[in-house]
Amino acid sequence: MKIVHIITRMILGGAQENTLLSVEGQQDDWGDDVTLITGPSSGPEGSLLERAAEGKRQVRILPELRRAIDPWKDWRSHQTLTRWLRELRPDIVHTHSSKAGILGRSAAWKLGLPVVHTIHGSPFHAYQSRVAHQAFRWAEWWAARRCDRLISVCDAMTSQYVAAGIAPTDKFVTVYSGMEVEPFLHPPRPRDEVRRELGVSPQDVVVAKVARLFELKGHDDVIAAAPQVLASNPHVRFLFIGDGVLQGPLQQQIAQLGLTPHFQFTGLVPPQRVPELLGASDMVVHCSLREGLARVLPQGLLAGRPVVSYDIDGAREVVIPQQTGCLLAPRDIPALTAAILELAGDRDLRERLGSTGRRLFTEQFRTQTMTRRLREIYQQVLDQRRNGRKQSA
């Protein structure tokens, strides 16, 4: 099968990892002819572009394809995408992220090519202006009429899009975002060795948070909970895994509270280090205020660690209270404090929740499960096209 994936940028992030693993799995496991089209990848978050271009993978960089809205560059991107897709003539076009999703779907539909789009997270949300919210909502409504199928990374994304009037329920299908599960099940290095490198003592309880240091990711909420947590349990250590523009301000905030010795920032780490860092931790906390389904939640469970998360978007599909972790109302700092303290003080509870999560979700989040489901969806779309049922919302 000839497939083209289009994504705005290949920074270190959940949507990008999903796209990269789809490309690799389709080419390596299924023998497909796969091309990845993306814009430039730059910034403190790090890039997956080098890995994407390894071996014989076909990667095309579209210089004008940028995240920020720029009418001239967006028009140029659309023209180039149309030209490249006309040249490549793929069986399926698969778009990801908002900008590439809108431009890519438009170009593919214009050429009559079968096209699907993955919703990794909603571009319209409660934390933006009304004008921006309405603009993104309209753009998604418009683009939904120019694709054959919408793939959600969790059921919550489907519910939000249907409620917003983007498309009817029968246009959506959920495919959980696959990942390489083995490094989480069996970390490449022993837990004790990694903890020693981090300067963590055997009695310390490490609370890990994996996310870009960026707005709405919830690092400030963890910091707000820390004084009460440490007053009750001074053995807790907070590990922030990731880089971003807020590292300086967050470190300053921690210093003002006199808590610098209790926090550690790893900075930018390659994805292959995340499993061993989670393995060296004792629980995973994720306080983001908007996500599709944060990959770190199943990753924490695959590592055998309980997870604490705000009840937003798809979190409740993997964070099951009393079974795999703690689900909290957003921005409820007292509840966040209590959840961290409960888990920090009960090793048996941590092990029970983590092992249950590992048992429930390992197969569901395997890369191979995702690529198999994607192929089934592609085939359904192609069959519908052959039968003259080009779907529109």
Residue ranges with predicted function:
Residues H5-G13, E17-K73, V245-L246:
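N-terminal strand-loop element at the rim of the active site
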Residues Q16-E24, V205-Q228, V245-Q251, P334:
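A conserved mid-protein helix/loop that constitutes part of the nucleotide-sugar donor-binding site
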Residues L81, L85, L268-V269, E276-S281:
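Short alpha-helical donor nucleotide-sugar binding micro-motif in glycosyltransferases
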Residues R146-F172, M179-F184:
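A short, active-site helix/loop in glycosyltransferases that binds the activated sugar's phosphate group
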Residues L289:
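Aromatic "clamp/platform" in nucleotide-sugar-dependent glycosyltransferases that forms part
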Residues P306-S309, V319:
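Short hydrophobic beta-strand element within catalytic cores of glycosyltransferases
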Residues P321-Q322, C326-I333, E342-R347:
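Conserved acidic donor-binding segment of nucleotide-sugar-dependent glycosyltransferases
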Residues A335, E342, L349-Q364, M370-E376:
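A short, well-ordered alpha-helix in the C-terminal region of glycosyltransferases
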